[in-house]
């Protein structure tokens, strides 16, 4: 399943909407997403599963590139 993750790069700063970044990640669950991103110390605001029509929309209208976490 593909997830869209809204996050701030620095955990120590107050979240500001204009600084929110997005990445797309393939994982089995929201917990798996958070586990994979844990080592980056991102301030994760929201994790959203992207399926069906929503996925097709994101592919057509956004820069949907899956992040590879090693």
Curated annotation (Swiss-Prot):
Q: Which reaction does it catalyse?
A: RNA(n) + a ribonucleoside 5'-triphosphate = RNA(n+1) + diphosphate
> Source organism's superkingdom?
Bacteria
- GO biological process terms held by the UniProt record: DNA-templated transcription
**MF (Gene Ontology):** DNA binding; DNA-directed RNA polymerase activity
What Pfam families has UniProt attached to this entry?
RpoY (PF07288)
Keywords assigned = DNA-directed RNA polymerase, Nucleotidyltransferase, Transcription, Transferase
Enzyme Commission number, as recorded: 2.7.7.6
Q: What is this protein called?
A: DNA-directed RNA polymerase subunit epsilon
> What are the GO cellular component annotations?
DNA-directed RNA polymerase complex
Q: What does this protein do?
A: A non-essential component of RNA polymerase (RNAP).
- Signal sequence, renumbered to the chain: none
Spell out the family assignment given in the record's similarity comment. Answer: Belongs to the RNA polymerase subunit epsilon family.
Q: What is said about its interaction partners and assembly?
A: RNAP is composed of a core of 2 alpha, a beta and a beta' subunit. The core is associated with a delta subunit, and at least one of epsilon or omega. When a sigma factor is associated with the core the holoenzyme is formed, which can initiate transcription.
């Amino acid at each position: 399943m593909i997830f869209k993750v809204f996050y701030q790069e620095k955990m120590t700063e107050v979240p500001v909407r204009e600084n929110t970044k997005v990445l797309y990640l393939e994982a089995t669950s929201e917990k798996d997403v958070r586990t994979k991103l844990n080592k980056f110390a991102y301030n994760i605001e929201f994790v959203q599963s992207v399926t069906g029509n929503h996925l097709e929309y994101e592919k057509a209208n956004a820069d949907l590139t899956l992040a590879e976490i090693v």
